[in-house]
Each structure stands twice: as C-alpha cells, then as structure tokens.
Design a protein with these regions (language model features):
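Gly/Pro-rich hinge or "lid" segments in bacterial periplasmic/extracellular proteins
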Residues: 153-209, 213, 333-338, 342, ...
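A structural "hinge/loop" feature
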Residues: 31-47, 69-71, 96, 148-158, ...
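N-terminal lobe/hinge region of extracytoplasmic solute-binding protein
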Residues: 28-77, 105-108, 115, 180-181, ...
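Detector for C-terminal structural segments
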Residues: 24-25, 191-194, 200, 293-327, ...
Length: 526
C-alpha cells in the first residue's frame, strides 16, 4: 500500500468513534477478510471463516476431537463409513434449519469442486454423502482414512453454509449469495481497505459473544498495528508473531496493567522451501550448503528476540509420528564452503561463486508487508553471501507470493507447516498437489514419485506402528534431500488492552476465540 493510501486509512481510523465498552471489540488484520466462502481459499481469511462457519467436530488443544455440530458419531469396522448424529435446534443465522439435508447440500457443493480441494486427501477418499434421517448424516469413503475426523475439523472446506445462500444450482465454486453460517458471528459490513464488521449472532446455539460487534480494521503494516494498540485504536493483536515486530511485542507486553500479552507454545515450523526443479537449487550440494550456512541461533536471538525456538527439522519431534531420529544439518560455514567447492562452484575475485560461467545466484521471495520475513530474509542473504551465494530479495503482495508457491516461480520462498490439526497428515497430503510450495520444491527430486506414493500409504495406514514407520522414512528422505531450510518453530502472540478479558489461545493457529473474550468489567462467569 502506498504512503498516501496508508495515511488515508489512518485518518479514517483516527476519526472513528469507538462505542462504549461491551459493545465493540476491535482487532486488525493486514487485508479485508474476503467474501467468506466457506468452501474456498484466498482471499478468504481463515480466522474469519472460522468465526462464521462451524464444523461437525472440533479439534481440541490436547489433540482429541470433540462433538460440535455433530453430537455423536460411529465408525464402521472397516473404517469406511462415518455416521453422525446432528445437534438438534441449530439454525443458520438466516433462520434456515441446520439438518442432514443442509449437511449433504454442503458436501455436494464441496465435492462438485473436488479438484480444487485435491491437496486434502479426504476429498479424494469420499465416495458419497447420504441423508440417514432428519438429523442423521452418513459419510462413506472409498477406503479407510485415518485423519478423517481431524480433517473434518479444519477451518475449510468442510464447514457449513446456509443452503439458501449457495450459488446457482446449490454450488459454491463460483461464489455465494451471502456468508451465512451457524457460528457466533455474522459478517455485516465490508469497507474495502478500511475494515470488516461482524455482529454477534443472536440465534447462536452455543455461548453468546459478550461483544455486540467485532470490527476488524485493515492495517497492513506491523509497526502501524503496534501503534494502534498502544494508542487504543484497536483492543487486540493476535496471531502469528509477525503481526507486530517482536521488539514491539516485548515492549507492549511489559506495559501492565494497561496492556497484557502472552506467547503460545510452538504451533508450526517456519521454513524456506528450496526449489529442486530450478537452477541453482536443483543441485543438492547447493541446497545442503544453504542448510549448513545459516546461523539460526543468531537469527532467532537477534531477529525473533528469542520468542521462537530454533527448528532443525520440518516438524518438531513432538508432532505425532514425526520423531524420525534425524541428525540436524547444523550450522557449519566451513562445511558449507567445502560442499560448494567439491561441487565445482568456484569463487571469483569478488568472493561470489560460479560454475561454467553461471553465477551461483538465487532469488528469495517473501511477503513485502511482513517485517519479520523481510528481516529474516536479510539475515539469510548475508549468511549466504559469506559462502559465495548471491541472494536477490523479492518482496511482493501475499497473493503474488502464494501464486509463486503454486507455480514454482521461486528459488527460495517462505512457508510454514500448518500446525494442528493439519500436521502432519494434511500437510503431507498437500505435498502431492501443486497447491503450495512443497510440491514445487520437491518436483525436481528423482524420488518424487516414491515420496507421493509413501504419503498415500501413510494416509491409508490403519496400524499406528506402520504409519509411524512410513512417516519416518518419508521425513528422512525429505531431510536428506535438503529441500527445506527449517528456521524456527512459529508461535502465536497476543497483546490486549486492559479493557478486554478472557483472551486466550485457541487450539489451532488459524482460529481466534473472539466469542470467549469479554469486557474486563464483566463478571468472569458471564
């Protein structure tokens, strides 16, 4: 966004009059939340989709699955049929009943656009959806699929839109009439580049929000967002650590009692994906050298202010089935130089390397408005220059970076694992489709067909020991191929003003428990 546009947004926000406590909770996000189609992806923002739409079952912080729009379920002995009993008395916010017919209509709409969801293995495995009674729904799979319940709990696509709000012919692939769900919030106004306003759903079946309105102001710049919290323009910062600069978080967190803050347990892994199908990172020696050349301990200490622990592998060993007993590549600049020397990448008089007249140069792509990614990229650029690799930094809009991830126009590019409940199964599943950077990063590997076949076997494995064995083999192959540079284990942060109470972390990185928050003056047992 230009400085002039940023100023215009700031003026509009500064002139806004905040209502009395208890009426409005004000948050911010870098972009508008999008049209909020529950069955599609960007520009729809996941935290907002999860505020309006609900799943059959919900993921808990302890890794278990709890009833939600379904109160109970059974699984057939062969693992192929799931029978759900739906919660009675639930309606969509437009008054349409939530029943088995509505559930089937949503599954039909999702499966009519099955190719768009091929990254998620459950959509491949669903054979049919059936109405088994007014409040009884049956899902029949082609084969057993261990992560079925966890994938049904994801923020998208298996959430429920009022059938009355679907597009022509009951479809959603080309758009919806309105974002109408069963959740605690309703999207009531969007002002492009300014804000999105949600109203509490008065017919919500669960615990009612304590605030009448949730306003999400569009603030692209992390520094501006930190200032907005400090001045009282917004009440809450919540999300990945890059929402505000880490030094601003540490400063604001210590301003009690006016402001309070917290850091979550590690939720995901921040990585760079290295493109094995594009020179010069098609050379395994170059990928290994990059892994050995980055001083992650210094990076974590100086750029991330120690908020995120160093990552050595794609998944933390605490992730289910992910402790593969691997040895970290480890920071060793001398070893990185030897790898490049032995691979024929010779230094020139300027200290940079080349082979056969081709310079050892690579592009590193990052979200331009993400100050944290930019700072990390600059450290990596400097570390790689020390071993003779020239890095050109490219900062672009998030949508452009997502497009690069999908089509492979990158040398190095930022990414993250997705945290619970995606990791590891759903994240691994997505590696088989060109929907994220992982497919493109792996595409040049000779063993790519074997990698994809192993992922398919992992998802079908009913025996936990066999699934763990297969996962360990897969993670070993990816680690040895060096197509990822793990950087740190990403955390969520929250900072809120003293007028807000009940702020806590959700079970996943992409869902914000706004409905649990309340004015500090309210009783805790409200």
């Amino acid at each position: 966004m230009s400085k002039l546009a940023s100023l215009a947004v700031a003026v509009v926000m500064a002139c806004a009059v905040a209502p009395a406590a208890g009426q409005q909770l004000t948050y911010s996000w870098p972009t508008n939340v999008g049209p909020l189609n529950p069955h599609l992806y960007a520009p729809n923002q996941m935290f907002a989709q999860a505020s309006v739409y609900e799943p059959l079952v919900r993921y808990r912080a302890d890794g278990t699955i709890e009833p939600w729009l379904a109160t109970a379920w059974t699984v057939s002995p062969d693992g192929r049929t799931y029978d759900f009993i739906l919660r009675p008395g639930v309606t969509f916010s437009d008054g349409t009943p939530f029943d088995a017919a509505a559930v089937k209509a949503n599954f039909d709409a999702i499966l009519a656009n099955r190719a768009r969801h091929e990254w998620l293995d459950l959509t491949r495995q669903i054979d049919r959806a059936e109405i088994a009674g007014p409040l009884a729904f049956r899902l029949v799979l082609k084969a057993p699929h261990d992560p079925t319940l966890r994938e049904l709990a994801l923020p998208r696509p298996f959430r429920f839109l009022s059938p009355a709000a679907m597009g022509e012919g009951g479809t959603t692939a080309s758009g919806i009439k309105a974002p109408v769900g069963t959740g605690p919030w309703r999207l009531v106004e969007t002002r492009l580049g300014i804000s999105d306003t949600f109203a509490a759903n008065p017919t919500y079946w669960g615990g009612k929000p304590a605030f009448a309105r949730l306003v999400v102001k569009v603030i692209p710049d992390p520094n501006t967002r930190a200032i907005a919290l400090q001045t009282g323009e917004i009440d809450l910062v919540y999300g990945a650590a890059g929402q505000i600069p880490s030094e601003a978080f540490l400063r604001l967190r210590d301003q009690a009692p006016a402001v309070s803050g917290a850091v979550s347990a590690p939720l995901a892994t921040r990585v760079l994906a290295l493109n094995s199908a594009r020179a010069p990172t098609d050379d395994r020696a170059v990928r290994l050298a990059i892994n050995r050349a980055v001083d992650k301990d210094t990076l974590v200490r100086t750029v991330l202010d120690g908020l995120e622990p160093r990552a050595d592998f794609l998944f933390a060993p605490s992730v289910p089935d992910a402790d593969a007993g691997l040895t970290p590549h480890g920071f060793d600049r001398a070893a990185a130089n030897r790898l490049l020397d032995e691979a024929g990448w010779a230094r020139g008089t300027d200290g940079m390397r080349a082979k056969g007249g081709r310079p050892l140069a690579v592009e590193l792509d990052f979200v331009g408005t993400n100050a944290q990614q930019k700072a990390i990229a600059e450290v990596i650029q400097a570390d790689l220059a020390r071993i003779g690799i020239a890095v050109r930094l490219v900062g672009e809009e998030e949508s452009a970076i997502l497009a690069r991830q999908k089509d492979g126009r990158f040398g190095l590019i930022f990414g993250e694992t997705w945290g619970p409940p995606y990791d590891p199964a759903s994240f691994l599943s997505a590696m088989r489709a060109p929907s994220h950077a992982d497919y493109q990063a792996q595409r040049g590997l000779p063993e790519k067909p074997e990698i994809d076949a192993t992922i398919t076997a992992i998802l079908a494995a009913a025996d936990p020991a066999e699934r763990k064995r297969l996962t360990a083999g897969l993670l070993t192959a990816l680690h040895e191929s060096a197509v990822y540079l793990p950087i740190s284990h990403a955390v969520a942060i929250e900072v809120h003003r003293s007028a807000i109470a009940g702020v806590g972390f959700g079970a996943t990185l992409n869902e914000i428990p706004f409905a649990a928050m309340r004015p500090a003056s309210d009783r805790a047992d409200r």
